[in-house]
Amino acid sequence: MTTTEKIQPRLKVRYREEIKDALAKEFNYANVMQIPGVVKVVVNMGVGDAARDAKLINGAVEDLALITGQKPQIRKATKSIAQFKLREGMPIGAKVTLRGDRMWEFLDRLVSIALPRIRDFRGLSPKQFDGNGNYTFGLSEQSMFHEIDVDKIDRPRGMDITVVTTATNNEEGRALLKHLGFPFKEN
């Protein structure tokens, strides 16, 4: 019987074979475990209008499932806010946490396919790190992902993408993401 070997994600292989060594040289780490890596990627889609029309959340859930390849978790309002006509427990967003191979595949698709397809894209802001090497950025619509059929979009939806790393500061996090292929703006 032949054993089928599991195909490793392209970006994961590149990280293990090239990027780890480059980061170790750049920051002179004493221990291999100090080299920063990616822990998880959280993709969040807030659908505030779902407070008025509950059907809107379904479109967001379908889009996120197509983009990430994983069923999203529906986020509910934690407290009522009268001005927004919002009741506690109403669905107002959807999020997906990607880890492991799915995370590497998503990052690869994001960097090599989705970001270059954005109109008038000048690069990601290098200032959106949180102080601990984690990076968060927003996308204004979902059409740049090739999994989404542009003709079937009911409305453009933005999303927040957070890349959580084991880096201890912004400099290490920025170096890691730059090596992974994130296109940062030059100041």
Curated annotation (Swiss-Prot):
Keyword tRNA-binding: yes
SS bonds (residue pairs): none
Keywords: Ribonucleoprotein, Ribosomal protein, RNA-binding, rRNA-binding, tRNA-binding
Single GO biological process annotation from the record: translation
Function summary: This is one of the proteins that bind and probably mediate the attachment of the 5S RNA into the large ribosomal subunit, where it forms part of the central protuberance. In the 70S ribosome it contacts protein S13 of the 30S subunit (bridge B1b), connecting the 2 subunits; this bridge is implicated in subunit movement. Contacts the P site tRNA; the 5S rRNA and some of its associated proteins might help stabilize positioning of ribosome-bound tRNAs.
NCBIfam families attached to this UniProt entry: PRK00010.1 (NF000585)
One annotated GO molecular function: structural constituent of ribosome
HAMAP family in the cross-refs: Ribosomal_uL5_B
GO (cellular component) term, any one: ribonucleoprotein complex
SUPFAM superfamilies, sorted: RL5-like
Domain of life: Bacteria
Gene3D superfamilies linked: 3.30.1440.10
Protein species of origin: Nocardia farcinica (strain IFM 10152)
Protein name per Swiss-Prot or TrEMBL: Large ribosomal subunit protein uL5
Keyword Ribonucleoprotein applies: yes
Signal sequence bounds: none
Family of the protein in this entry: Belongs to the universal ribosomal protein uL5 family.
Subunit field text: Part of the 50S ribosomal subunit; part of the 5S rRNA/L5/L18/L25 subcomplex. Contacts the 5S rRNA and the P site tRNA. Forms a bridge to the 30S subunit in the 70S ribosome.
Residues forming coiled coils: none
